[in-house]
Amino acid sequence: MAKRISVKLVKSTIGQKQPVCSTIRSLGLKKLNSTVEHDANPAVLGMVKRVAHLVEVKELN
């Protein structure tokens, strides 16, 4: 079974560049404090790394 991660948007995207906002939307995050779960594959981990200053990541068991 693949590892899963939980991604929570903790800071607003107001004032951020368009690629950062697009990455947040691609992860499935819309509003502040919204949370989504993803498989921890290289594509998702790369997106999370790009917006690490706006999100909080937890590894799920």
From Swiss-Prot:
GO terms for biological process: translation. The keyword Cell membrane does not apply. Signal peptide: none annotated. This is Large ribosomal subunit protein uL30. GO terms for cellular component: cytosolic large ribosomal subunit. It comes from Treponema denticola (strain ATCC 35405 / DSM 14222 / CIP 103919 / JCM 8153 / KCTC 15104). It holds the Pfam family Ribosomal_L30. Belongs to the universal ribosomal protein uL30 family. Keywords: Ribonucleoprotein, Ribosomal protein. NCBIfam families: rpmD_bact. CDD domains: Ribosomal_L30. InterPro entries: Ribo_uL30_ferredoxin-like_sf (IPR036919), Ribosomal_uL30_bac-type (IPR005996), Ribosomal_uL30_CS (IPR018038), Ribosomal_uL30_ferredoxin-like (IPR016082). Part of the 50S ribosomal subunit. One of its GO terms (molecular function) is structural constituent of ribosome. Disulfide bonds: none annotated. The gene is rpmD.
